[in-house]
């Protein structure tokens, strides 16, 4: 979760009232923030936020804005925002190359003038930039931001897809490097180049004199892209891959600059070719948020309250949220700097915070029930105890993984596996149908530890339901364990299996397994009353090599659900 350090005097100046540290701690509570200490030497307050949905609070100006609104009823007005059908006068243009639509499509900006930046303001701006890009911007992948002295920039600015061989002097260096060299040599290139390095061309910002402004989202130009104490005219741009996230980040920063005392001058972004949007140009900062409907009955039902519409609207106003009624329906208008109202429930949460948690009295539950462990969980715990008693160490794994680990390395078919239709990353593309790949992956990184290794997991697996005409899935609880060492053989694991089922008081039958990941003749399927419930055996050298394992391994896996139902 985001942690920020803000100068206490700057913060209290914006709030407009002095508070002790303990009072500040109380002021932060409604906004899911915790007072984490005060450094007398630096004069900074340390604050930790327990929510990532409100990036507008991660600066001293944004936090002061919310506190003034909540406790003193001061809702700010930001009249520099454009709206649909009402674009403000623009003071510069950003021209977007149509090739950027497949790389990093969105860029928006504004100019800020009229205030001299001092050292503490600059430090606060840089910290906010970092927090915004790291947390809300997902380490610059989703959103990245740049700040520049606008006196060195000639508009219009071009946002182009450039050759990786294009050279300029990056910030913090005194020699020219190509974009490829920046990726490989510059600290920021090493940290962030993975975001764009798979593309044939890279994003570049050029002014009208063809000077490089920045290489987003990696690094600014050394000649133009550094903000200094004493600067008064600033250009701010935000690039990103998500339209609304990019716009919101720019809106939040614009409101912060305005609250500091700057004049905000809008900048127009011109898309030379539509990017699947319903416009070809946009004057920013731009208000894009949609109104959200709410129902008074739903508010009172979820909160267990009896609030009137008027009281609800007052509570929302304390959160900086305006509301109105039309045709017997009620709507909230999200503030310029917020986009966290996805559902009526989000509105109700703001009503609750606006009312104050102390105004809601605790009640005993009206329903009474006695809880207990399910039979499956009790049986699973017995199995865990047996495994620990036999010298195994319990592991806990993620249920999702890659095709490479679950299927390719195991040399098996993907017939039983569930695949995510739109995965964020290939590392979490499939839901596991077996625990064995997880155990082997652990073993592959454990060669430095003394042998033998004995690990197990009791966990969920999911299989396609192949026995019906309707698509579906079956979820089971499985036990799997792995033994590795120079002396580990089929006889060793067979002895452990026999001991396990002896203490479970279950009789099983064994038949030779045809699974590809076992050595021929050294794998067995486990049958209980003619039903196959699992298997065990020695892993083949081919599979071991796929995982980078160079020591013999034997594995076991059984379906606990079937074990219970058939025993």
Swiss-Prot record:
SUPFAM superfamilies in alphabetical order: Class II aaRS and biotin synthetases (SSF55681), Putative DNA-binding domain (SSF46955)
BP-aspect Gene Ontology terms: phenylalanyl-tRNA aminoacylation
Residues annotated for Mg(2+) binding in this entry: 340, 346, 349-350
Domain B5 stretches: 287-362
Pfam families, per database record: B5, PhetRS_B1, tRNA_synthFbeta
Keywords: Aminoacyl-tRNA synthetase, ATP-binding, Cytoplasm, Ligase, Magnesium, Metal-binding, Nucleotide-binding, Protein biosynthesis
Location, primary (coarse class): cytoplasm
Record-linked Gene3D superfamilies: 3.30.56.10, Bira Bifunctional Protein, Domain 2, Phenylalanyl-trna Synthetase, Chain B, domain 3
NCBIfam families found in the cross-reference section: pheT_arch (TIGR00471)
Annotated family: Belongs to the phenylalanyl-tRNA synthetase beta subunit family. Type 2 subfamily.
Record protein name field: Phenylalanine--tRNA ligase beta subunit
Source organism of this protein record: Borreliella afzelii (strain PKo)
Gene: pheT
């Amino acid at each position: 979760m985001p942690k920020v350090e803000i100068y206490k005097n700057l913060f209290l100046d914006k709030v407009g009232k002095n508070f002790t540290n303990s009072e500040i701690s109380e002021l932060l509570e409604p906004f899911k923030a915790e007072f984490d200490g005060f450094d007398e030497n630096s004069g900074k307050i340390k604050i930790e936020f327990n929510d990532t949905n409100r990036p507008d609070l991660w600066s001293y100006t944004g936090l002061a804005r919310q506190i003034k609104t909540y406790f003193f009823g001061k809702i700010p007005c930001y009249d520099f925002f454009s709206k649909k059908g009402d674009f403000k006068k623009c003071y510069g243009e950003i021209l977007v190359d149509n090739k950027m639509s497949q790389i990093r499509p969105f860029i928006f900006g504004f100019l800020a003038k009229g205030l001299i930046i001092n050292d503490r303001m600059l430090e606060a701006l840089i910290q906010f930039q970092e927090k915004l890009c790291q947390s809300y911007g997902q380490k610059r992948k989703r959103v990245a931001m740049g700040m520049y002295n606008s006196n060195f920039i000639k508009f219009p600015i071009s946002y182009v897809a450039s050759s990786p061989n294009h050279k300029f002097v990056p910030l913090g260096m005194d020699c020219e490097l190509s974009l490829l060299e920046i990726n490989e040599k510059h600290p920021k290139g090493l940290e962030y180049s993975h975001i764009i390095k798979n593309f044939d061309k890279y994003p570049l910002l050029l002014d009208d004199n063809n000077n490089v402004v920045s290489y987003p989202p990696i690094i600014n130009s050394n000649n133009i892209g550094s903000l200094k104490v004493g600067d008064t005219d600033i250009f701010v741009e935000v690039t990103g891959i998500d339209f609304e996230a990019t716009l919101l980040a720019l809106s939040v920063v614009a409101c912060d600059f305005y609250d500091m005392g700057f004049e905000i001058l809008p900048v127009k972004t011109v898309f030379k070719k539509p990017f699947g949007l319903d416009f070809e140009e946009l004057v920013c900062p731009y208000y894009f948020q949609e109104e959200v409907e709410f129902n008074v009955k739903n508010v009172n039902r979820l909160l267990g309250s009896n609030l009137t519409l008027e009281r609800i609207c007052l509570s929302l106003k304390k959160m900086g949220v305006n509301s109105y009624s039309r045709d017997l329906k009620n709507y909230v208008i999200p503030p310029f700097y917020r986009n966290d109202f996805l559902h009526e429930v989000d509105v109700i949460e703001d009503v609750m915070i606006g009312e104050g948690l102390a105004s809601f009295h605790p009640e005993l539950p009206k329903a009474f029930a006695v809880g207990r462990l399910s039979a499956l969980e009790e049986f699973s715990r017995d199995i865990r105890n047996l495994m620990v008693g036999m010298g195994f160490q319990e592991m806990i794994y993620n249920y999702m993984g890659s095709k490479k680990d679950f299927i390719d390395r195991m040399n098996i078919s993907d017939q039983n596996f569930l695949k995510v239709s739109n995965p964020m990353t290939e590392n979490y593309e499939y839901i596991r149908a077996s625990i064995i790949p997880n155990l082997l992956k652990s073993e592959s990184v454990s060669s430095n530890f003394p042998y033998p290794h004995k690990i197990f997991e009791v966990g969920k697996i999911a299989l396609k339901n192949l026995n019906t005409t309707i698509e579906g899935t079956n979820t089971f609880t499985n036990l799997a364990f792995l033994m590795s060492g120079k002396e580990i053989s089929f006889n060793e694991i067979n002895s452990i299996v026999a001991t396990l089922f002896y203490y479970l008081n279950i009789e099983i039958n064994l038949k030779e397994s045809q699974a590809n990941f076992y050595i021929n003749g050294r794998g067995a399927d486990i049958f209980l009353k003619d039903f196959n419930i699992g298997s065990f055996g020695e892993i083949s050298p081919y599979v071991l090599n796929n995982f980078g394992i160079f020591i013999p391994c034997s594995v076991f896996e059984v379906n606990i659900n079937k074990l219970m139902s058939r025993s």
